[in-house]
Amino acid sequence: MVLEVFPVQATKKEGKFDLYNEIRKLVKENGISLNEGDILVISSKYISISQGRILDHNSIKLSEKANELSREFSINLKLSEAIVRESDVVFGGVSGFVITSSNNIMAPNAGIDKSNSQGKLILYPNDPYQVAEQIKRKFFLDYHVHVGIIIVDSRLMPARIGTSGVAIACSGIEPVSDRRATKDLDGNVLKVTFQATADNLASIANHKMGEGDELLPMAIIRESGAKLTDRKISSEETAIPYDECVYVRGLKK
Protein backbone atom coordinates (compact mmCIF):
# COMPACT_ATOMS: atom_id res chain seq x y z
CA MET A 1 0.00 0.00 0.00
CA VAL A 2 1.57 3.27 -1.18
CA LEU A 3 0.04 6.62 -0.30
CA GLU A 4 -0.56 8.83 -3.35
CA VAL A 5 -1.65 12.46 -3.68
CA PHE A 6 -3.39 13.87 -6.77
CA PRO A 7 -3.71 17.69 -6.85
CA VAL A 8 -6.78 19.05 -8.64
CA GLN A 9 -6.26 22.00 -10.99
CA ALA A 10 -8.95 24.69 -11.02
CA THR A 11 -9.72 28.14 -12.39
CA LYS A 12 -9.82 31.26 -10.25
CA LYS A 13 -13.11 31.97 -8.51
CA GLU A 14 -14.20 35.39 -7.26
CA GLY A 15 -17.91 35.00 -6.45
CA LYS A 16 -20.35 32.49 -4.98
CA PHE A 17 -20.72 29.17 -6.79
CA ASP A 18 -22.12 25.66 -6.31
CA LEU A 19 -19.28 23.95 -4.47
CA TYR A 20 -20.28 20.31 -4.96
CA ASN A 21 -20.99 20.64 -8.68
CA GLU A 22 -17.70 22.48 -9.16
CA ILE A 23 -15.81 19.73 -7.33
CA ARG A 24 -17.40 17.05 -9.52
CA LYS A 25 -16.58 19.01 -12.67
CA LEU A 26 -12.96 19.61 -11.69
CA VAL A 27 -12.31 16.02 -10.67
CA LYS A 28 -13.60 14.87 -14.06
CA GLU A 29 -11.64 17.53 -15.99
CA ASN A 30 -8.43 16.50 -14.20
CA GLY A 31 -8.93 12.89 -15.27
CA ILE A 32 -9.17 11.65 -11.69
CA SER A 33 -11.82 9.47 -10.09
CA LEU A 34 -12.79 9.22 -6.45
CA ASN A 35 -12.36 5.63 -5.30
CA GLU A 36 -13.59 3.85 -2.20
CA GLY A 37 -11.57 5.07 0.79
CA ASP A 38 -10.08 8.13 -0.91
CA ILE A 39 -9.72 11.38 1.04
CA LEU A 40 -10.73 14.61 -0.70
CA VAL A 41 -8.94 17.61 0.81
CA ILE A 42 -10.41 21.04 0.02
CA SER A 43 -9.00 24.51 0.69
CA SER A 44 -10.97 26.43 3.32
CA LYS A 45 -10.53 29.60 1.26
CA TYR A 46 -12.09 27.91 -1.79
CA ILE A 47 -15.12 26.97 0.30
CA SER A 48 -15.35 30.48 1.77
CA ILE A 49 -15.43 31.98 -1.72
CA SER A 50 -18.17 29.53 -2.75
CA GLN A 51 -20.23 30.76 0.23
CA GLY A 52 -19.59 34.43 -0.48
CA ARG A 53 -17.71 34.80 2.81
CA ILE A 54 -15.86 37.87 1.53
CA LEU A 55 -15.96 41.31 3.14
CA ASP A 56 -15.43 44.49 1.15
CA HIS A 57 -13.58 47.12 3.18
CA ASN A 58 -16.17 49.74 2.24
CA SER A 59 -19.01 47.70 3.76
CA ILE A 60 -17.43 47.34 7.21
CA LYS A 61 -18.76 49.58 9.98
CA LEU A 62 -16.46 49.99 12.96
CA SER A 63 -17.24 49.28 16.61
CA GLU A 64 -15.51 50.60 19.71
CA LYS A 65 -14.05 47.15 20.34
CA ALA A 66 -12.43 47.26 16.90
CA ASN A 67 -10.90 50.64 17.69
CA GLU A 68 -9.44 49.27 20.91
CA LEU A 69 -8.03 46.18 19.17
CA SER A 70 -6.54 48.31 16.39
CA ARG A 71 -4.76 50.59 18.85
CA GLU A 72 -3.48 47.77 21.04
CA PHE A 73 -2.07 45.59 18.26
CA SER A 74 -1.40 48.11 15.45
CA ILE A 75 -3.89 46.49 13.08
CA ASN A 76 -5.89 48.06 10.26
CA LEU A 77 -9.27 49.20 11.59
CA LYS A 78 -11.30 47.25 9.04
CA LEU A 79 -9.39 44.05 9.78
CA SER A 80 -9.84 44.69 13.51
CA GLU A 81 -13.61 44.86 13.08
CA ALA A 82 -13.65 41.62 11.11
CA ILE A 83 -11.58 39.94 13.84
CA VAL A 84 -14.02 41.14 16.51
CA ARG A 85 -16.98 39.75 14.56
CA GLU A 86 -15.38 36.39 13.80
CA SER A 87 -13.77 35.61 17.18
CA ASP A 88 -15.21 33.81 20.19
CA VAL A 89 -12.09 34.45 22.29
CA VAL A 90 -9.18 36.89 22.00
CA PHE A 91 -6.12 35.64 23.88
CA GLY A 92 -3.74 38.51 23.14
CA GLY A 93 -1.27 39.25 20.39
CA VAL A 94 1.67 41.23 19.05
CA SER A 95 1.95 44.08 16.59
CA GLY A 96 -0.01 43.10 13.48
CA PHE A 97 -1.43 39.85 14.84
CA VAL A 98 -4.17 38.89 17.30
CA ILE A 99 -4.40 35.32 18.63
CA THR A 100 -8.04 34.27 18.55
CA SER A 101 -10.38 31.31 18.70
CA SER A 102 -13.58 30.71 16.78
CA ASN A 103 -15.55 27.45 16.77
CA ASN A 104 -12.65 25.62 18.43
CA ILE A 105 -10.16 26.86 15.82
CA MET A 106 -7.23 28.82 17.26
CA ALA A 107 -5.60 31.10 14.68
CA PRO A 108 -3.99 34.52 14.20
CA ASN A 109 -6.50 37.20 13.17
CA ALA A 110 -9.45 34.77 13.29
CA GLY A 111 -8.10 32.96 10.23
CA ILE A 112 -8.97 35.92 8.01
CA ASP A 113 -7.10 35.93 4.69
CA LYS A 114 -6.24 39.12 2.84
CA SER A 115 -3.23 37.91 0.83
CA ASN A 116 -4.93 37.29 -2.54
CA SER A 117 -8.29 39.01 -2.13
CA GLN A 118 -7.69 42.37 -3.91
CA GLY A 119 -8.37 44.56 -0.88
CA LYS A 120 -11.11 42.30 0.47
CA LEU A 121 -11.13 39.99 3.47
CA ILE A 122 -11.82 36.27 3.08
CA LEU A 123 -13.34 34.81 6.25
CA TYR A 124 -13.40 31.21 7.45
CA PRO A 125 -16.26 29.18 5.91
CA ASN A 126 -19.59 28.89 7.68
CA ASP A 127 -20.32 25.52 9.32
CA PRO A 128 -17.27 23.71 7.89
CA TYR A 129 -18.14 20.38 9.53
CA GLN A 130 -21.61 20.50 7.98
CA VAL A 131 -20.10 21.37 4.59
CA ALA A 132 -17.75 18.38 4.80
CA GLU A 133 -20.62 16.09 5.85
CA GLN A 134 -22.82 17.22 2.96
CA ILE A 135 -20.08 16.70 0.36
CA LYS A 136 -19.35 13.22 1.73
CA ARG A 137 -23.03 12.24 1.60
CA LYS A 138 -23.52 13.61 -1.92
CA PHE A 139 -20.57 11.62 -3.26
CA PHE A 140 -22.00 8.46 -1.72
CA LEU A 141 -25.46 9.10 -3.16
CA ASP A 142 -24.13 9.93 -6.64
CA TYR A 143 -21.21 7.49 -6.93
CA HIS A 144 -21.80 4.88 -4.19
CA VAL A 145 -18.31 5.33 -2.74
CA HIS A 146 -17.31 6.04 0.84
CA VAL A 147 -14.81 8.91 0.89
CA GLY A 148 -13.36 11.13 3.59
CA ILE A 149 -13.51 14.90 3.36
CA ILE A 150 -11.00 17.27 4.96
CA ILE A 151 -11.18 21.06 4.87
CA VAL A 152 -7.65 22.43 5.12
CA ASP A 153 -6.12 25.75 6.07
CA SER A 154 -2.45 26.68 6.33
CA ARG A 155 -1.18 27.52 9.77
CA LEU A 156 1.91 28.89 11.47
CA MET A 157 3.32 26.52 14.07
CA PRO A 158 4.81 27.83 17.34
CA ALA A 159 8.51 28.68 17.00
CA ARG A 160 8.73 27.21 13.48
CA ILE A 161 9.45 28.90 10.14
CA GLY A 162 6.79 28.47 7.47
CA THR A 163 3.26 27.14 7.35
CA SER A 164 1.76 23.67 7.38
CA GLY A 165 -1.71 22.31 6.74
CA VAL A 166 -4.30 21.81 9.46
CA ALA A 167 -7.77 20.30 9.26
CA ILE A 168 -10.38 22.86 10.30
CA ALA A 169 -13.11 20.27 9.66
CA CYS A 170 -13.58 16.75 8.36
CA SER A 171 -16.15 14.06 7.67
CA GLY A 172 -16.05 10.38 6.82
CA ILE A 173 -12.80 9.61 8.66
CA GLU A 174 -11.83 9.26 12.30
CA PRO A 175 -9.95 12.54 12.88
CA VAL A 176 -7.84 11.29 15.78
CA SER A 177 -6.27 7.91 16.45
CA ASP A 178 -6.06 6.95 20.12
CA ARG A 179 -2.70 5.22 20.61
CA ARG A 180 -2.96 4.88 24.37
CA ALA A 181 -2.31 1.38 25.73
CA THR A 182 -0.25 0.48 22.65
CA LYS A 183 3.52 0.06 22.96
CA ASP A 184 6.46 1.98 21.54
CA LEU A 185 9.60 0.38 20.04
CA ASP A 186 11.04 -0.25 23.49
CA GLY A 187 7.90 -1.96 24.75
CA ASN A 188 6.77 0.97 26.88
CA VAL A 189 3.00 1.44 27.11
CA LEU A 190 1.86 4.78 25.67
CA LYS A 191 -0.21 6.74 28.17
CA VAL A 192 -1.13 10.04 26.51
CA THR A 193 -0.47 9.67 22.78
CA PHE A 194 -3.13 10.60 20.25
CA GLN A 195 -2.27 10.77 16.54
CA ALA A 196 -3.85 13.72 14.70
CA THR A 197 -4.87 11.78 11.58
CA ALA A 198 -6.90 14.55 9.91
CA ASP A 199 -4.22 17.18 10.57
CA ASN A 200 -1.46 14.91 9.26
CA LEU A 201 -3.36 14.22 6.03
CA ALA A 202 -4.22 17.91 5.68
CA SER A 203 -0.53 18.77 5.84
CA ILE A 204 0.36 16.13 3.23
CA ALA A 205 -2.24 17.50 0.83
CA ASN A 206 -1.35 21.12 1.57
CA HIS A 207 2.24 20.43 0.50
CA LYS A 208 0.99 19.46 -2.97
CA MET A 209 -1.69 22.16 -3.20
CA GLY A 210 0.78 24.97 -2.53
CA GLU A 211 0.42 28.43 -0.99
CA GLY A 212 0.70 30.77 -3.99
CA ASP A 213 -0.76 31.01 -7.48
CA GLU A 214 -0.86 27.28 -8.20
CA LEU A 215 -4.70 27.21 -8.42
CA LEU A 216 -4.80 23.79 -6.76
CA PRO A 217 -7.65 24.17 -4.23
CA MET A 218 -8.12 20.42 -3.80
CA ALA A 219 -6.20 17.18 -3.63
CA ILE A 220 -7.19 13.52 -3.47
CA ILE A 221 -5.24 11.27 -1.12
CA ARG A 222 -5.31 7.56 -1.95
CA GLU A 223 -4.29 4.64 0.31
CA SER A 224 -4.02 6.91 3.34
CA GLY A 225 -4.74 4.14 5.83
CA ALA A 226 -7.20 6.42 7.63
CA LYS A 227 -10.15 4.75 9.33
CA LEU A 228 -13.44 5.55 7.59
CA THR A 229 -16.61 6.26 9.55
CA ASP A 230 -20.25 7.10 8.82
CA ARG A 231 -20.81 8.94 12.09
CA LYS A 232 -20.98 12.72 12.18
CA ILE A 233 -17.78 14.41 13.40
CA SER A 234 -17.81 17.52 15.60
CA SER A 235 -15.20 20.19 16.29
CA GLU A 236 -14.91 19.06 19.93
CA GLU A 237 -13.23 15.84 18.76
CA THR A 238 -10.19 17.64 17.36
CA ALA A 239 -9.79 20.33 20.02
CA ILE A 240 -8.97 20.37 23.71
CA PRO A 241 -10.14 22.89 26.31
CA TYR A 242 -7.79 25.86 26.36
CA ASP A 243 -7.12 25.41 30.07
CA GLU A 244 -5.60 22.03 29.14
CA CYS A 245 -3.50 23.33 26.21
CA VAL A 246 0.20 23.60 27.09
CA TYR A 247 0.70 26.59 24.78
CA VAL A 248 -2.25 28.62 26.07
CA ARG A 249 -1.51 27.79 29.70
CA GLY A 250 2.15 28.67 29.21
CA LEU A 251 1.36 32.04 27.61
CA LYS A 252 -0.98 32.98 30.46
CA LYS A 253 1.79 32.82 33.06
Feature locations, PLM:
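N-terminal and secondary-structure boundary signal
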Residues: 1-253
